[in-house]
Amino acid sequence: MADDIRILMCPPDHYDVDYVINPWMEGNIHKSSQERAVEQWKKLHQTIKECAIVDLVKPAKGWPDMVFTANAGLVLGENVVLSRFYHKERQGEEPYFKAWFEENGFTVYELPQDLPFEGAGDALFDREGRWLWAGYGFRSELDSHPYIAKWLDTEVVSLRLIDERFYHLDTCFCPLSGGYLLYYPPAFDAYSNRVIEMRIPPEKRIIVEELDAVNFACNAVNVNDIIIMNLVSRTLKEKLAEAGFKVRETPLTEFLKAGGAAKCLTLRVTEPILPDVHATVSIESRVIRMEGHLLDAGILNQALDLVVENSGSFRVLNFNLGVERNSTSSAEVRVSAPSHQIMEEIMTELIDLGAVPPPQELCDINTETVTQGGVAPDDFYVSTIYPTEVRVNCEWVQVTGQRMDAAIVVTSNPPSARCVLLRDLQVGDRVMVGVEGIRTIKKVESHEGGTRKENKEFAFMAAGVSSERRVELLVEQIAWEMRQIRDQGGKIVVTAGPVVIHTGGAQHLSHLVREGYVHALLGGNAIAVHDIEQATMGTSLGVDMQRGIPVRGGHRHHLKIINSVRRYGGIRQAVEAGFISKGVMYECVKNNIPYCLAGSIRDDGPLPDTEMNLVRAQSRYSELIQGADMILMLSSMLHSIGVGNMTPSGVKMVCVDINPAVVTKLSDRGSVESVGVVTDVGLFLSLLVRQLQQLTRPYSLAETL
């Protein structure tokens, strides 16, 4: 027996499943056998007594879960951090455990009343005493970890639980002697699994399969080379034996009904202390402020969910609800993260939702100077599509050239900020790093949920369940907006792929160009080639556009077209020479509509007009979309995503594709101001032209007054 190891237990005199506070209790209320529970507890008690000293705390009537002493607190040396139970059903246990600790000479530390921490159920010392593994996500809060590190003077490693079946750390994680670890990886998020793998070498990690995990194999008591646990598989026993451990199985089925096993029924009150281990915690906290229709537009819920989904924790410090229907609300929220890296990721996404630091916190953003052309500092802030302001010389400065996936370069005299692509960074540029001192300016979503309505519409169409009537309704709205934009002198840009030509949409797109609904055309080599092929030879990719069947030798048509245009020197020259007499490119030339054809590695030819320098093509695209009010994206995922990344917030984007994944992909890239239409692009253009023709009178602002 190990005389230096003491374990606290509590007899199950009043044990029963009286309520449901975890998934294991569901369906088991009052279905536990008191007789079998006592029998199983006594067997566990006897098994532990053979290898350690067992102390007992007297059970209190009315608190059936007091038998699970692992949740009494966390002990190191003469100090104990008392538990703050998450559920009211267990909060009455706290004074009984506190009394026992004080009677036995421990110094008791108590967390704030509203900060849950459930003791050694969510905090497990490395068996070598090197650090403390601390769980959070269901019962314990991340913000409790700095207190624990301070009071127990130890390093705390935070792990986030994501499977509600494993609501406490000790249900899926068991540090073993010799630096080994018994655990169930799917119970943790990706970041926590990386942390575990960085701390524990592969040969020391013993992974538990789900069959053993749900039988609480990880909820085991380890005393030196002995592991006391519920019944487990032969495979797991062999793994443990290979690592040098002796497994002692004892059935604990009655306690599984309440979501506990061997470890839950025990609390080790003698933990190893290393003199060179001191308080260390990587947790970082920041306060953010949000304003707007936080509740009815779902902004606050979205922000809080974002924090949790990214391994963080939060506490709402202050919330002021708007008193009128049109009033805005405000909130101050403290956000905590297990590391600086995670905090930066969370803050980057919160900024996109309009979160800002309290005004008194920051005067200037952090910057680093570029030392190598075309290379940003490691921690540079990546811009988004939303209008952005940054703090320069203690004032908010509007960022110019707003677009996605760029760095922000600032100057102090005069104060300015602009988005710059990585390749355009110059030595000496001051680039913003981190996420402090930045905010996005987003339009306030009304209580009517205007933006949300569009998002729902987008999701409905992208789900692939739209009817033809639904498409027609969307086309009517799009046509009306296009008419307004044209008649008010606005700008509409079209990004189109060759499918427009293949589906018979060339005549309709030509009509839009001719009638002044297109002010710039973006695409690739293919749309121009097949448009000219259709205009001059009546085929597209060798298919007769009238009969819909391939023609003999049609597979060579596009190469003949490329060769002919190259002979003339370009598309404009071919139009002027009369070789091209109709089609999309013809109308662009005749109506002086600028276009850019961006090349790719698969292009045949290419046409002389095709820009094969990708950097120059991107720059030209960016120039042509400046000042756009609407962008039509017609069956070209690659070009559409590229354009979406260059487009600032506020520009209406209409994505048309037969594949729902394309419009979803566009949304995932951050192009949230989008309307998705899942339909054949040729049909869409036909409906659009018909609807525009029905709007016979020019839109006039005067007529509405």
From Swiss-Prot:
Q: Which amino acid positions bind L-ornithine, per UniProt? A: 22, 71, 90, 139, 168, 258, 264
Its protein name is Bifunctional arginine dihydrolase/ornithine cyclodeaminase ArgZ
- List the lineage, top down: Bacteria, Bacillati, Cyanobacteriota, Cyanophyceae, Synechococcales
Task: Give the site residues for Key determinant for dihydrolase activity.
Answer: 71
The gene from which this protein is expressed is argZ
- Mind telling me which Gene3D superfamilies this protein's record contains? conserved putative lor/sdh protein from methanococcus maripaludis s2 domain, L-arginine/glycine Amidinotransferase, Chain A, putative lor/sdh protein like domains
Q: What is the effect of changing residue 68 to A?
A: Significant loss of arginine dihydrolase activity
- Family recorded in the similarity comment: In the N-terminal section; belongs to the DDAH family.
| Pfam families on file | ArgZ-like_C_1st, ArgZ-like_C_2nd, DDAH_eukar, Saccharop_dh_N
